[in-house]
Amino acid sequence: MSEPIIVRQEAAVTILSINDAPYNRMSLDFMDRLEELVYEIAETASTRAVVLTAEGEDNFSVGMNLKQFAEGIERKGSADALLDQRLNVIRAIETMGKPWVATLFGYCLGGGLEVPLGCHFRLAAITDAQIGLPEMDIGGVPAWGGSARLTKCVGEHHAIDMILRAKKISGPEALRIGLVHEVHPIEELKAVAIRLAHELTAMPAGSIRSMLQVIVDGREKSLAELIQLEREAVIENRGTADSREGMLAFLEKRKPTFNQQS
């Protein structure tokens, strides 16, 4: 049986690729393996950025394998436990303090959008992408935090339109409403995502971790709480070797050499 996720390492970038082409369903084995990898990556200092993609160029993911729902309940003990696994994995991606870059191409539906919504960067294909939370079509609702994250990402207006109409949108439309950061030709998409991840690893890891905490936590905090959190990040950051090196390099008009201490 093939691995549900292909893992590659390029310097400080870990590349995870869903391995169930052409549909790249998010099977039970996929979610169990993703759970393992997420917590492993969080504790691996040598990984400073992650790319989440999929094999082939047909589809990122059509989402959960619905035929495995009953098996999943049996495996996890209850429907609630099965749901909590998904919610906890996506939340761990979101809060681990390392940037994740997701590639969206072909079908990106249900869980195939909800997992990328937990990532910090989303890049889409210019053509052929169909992105959405179409659970209404089968009498369901987004179950992995998708409705909340989509609303935070694109606003109530667009979230209502997409979810209540089970609407699938293109890459350029996703860019227009703020769901993705960039669009690229499908043949370039994965390379661009990996290049972006390498770019992020050149930044000071401690500063990235602090800012991701401020930004992600800011979705749930008041402005006053967020400002206090930012203040704490500033105090923590200014005592780091990377902060001192960055300031010294600026004054000396040279490129900084960060040691990536977090």
Regions found by a protein language model. Give the residues of each.
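C-terminal long alpha-helix characteristic of the crotonase
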Residues: 124-129, 180-228, 235-236, 241, ...
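CoA-thioester-processing core
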Residues: 89, 93, 103, 109-163, ...
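Terminal low-complexity tails and localization/encapsulation signals of metabolic enzymes
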Residues: 2, 248-262
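Conserved CoA-thioester-binding segment of acyl-CoA-metabolizing enzymes
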Residues: 1-53, 57, 91
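Well-ordered beta-strand positions
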Residues: 121, 161, 165-167, 173, ...
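Glycine- (often His-adjacent) and acidic-residue-rich active-site loop
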Residues: 54-92
